[in-house]
């Protein structure tokens, strides 16, 4: 159920050096295009500091300049943060959210616990009563709480 983040995305490759230098993770990029223009939505996160409105406004200006110089179509740009109950959508988000509390569905019920450690194909999930190694392919749903 959990998909793999596409690092071959053109927008990702244009901004990854900038966000990396700022200690900001790119969680998700959505690109919507029609004949004349498009919309680019980017979800960002930082473990080290809060991404407040002033920071996002400044970052928006820089990313917009980078994308306008390189993309051959018109677009609008939206930057946002993940929110407190974000669905975890890719395997790499388990690494990004290590130490965070999540609700996890493996069978048909949600269970609350923490992401202790993320590995290449799995992660350690800790509840009040157990620690278990969970393969990403076994995850039906996961979200932050």
Curated annotation (Swiss-Prot):
Family: Belongs to the RimP family.
Gene Ontology biological-process entries: ribosomal small subunit assembly; translation
Keyword Cytoplasm recorded: yes
A GO-annotated cellular component: cytosol
UniProt cross-references to PANTHER family, sorted A to Z: RIBOSOME MATURATION FACTOR RIMP
Reported function: Required for maturation of 30S ribosomal subunits.
Location in or out of the cell: Cytoplasm
Keyword entries, A-Z: Cytoplasm, Ribosome biogenesis
Protein name as catalogued: Ribosome maturation factor RimP
Keyword Protein biosynthesis: no
Disulphides: none
One matching Pfam family: RimP_N
Transmembrane segments: none
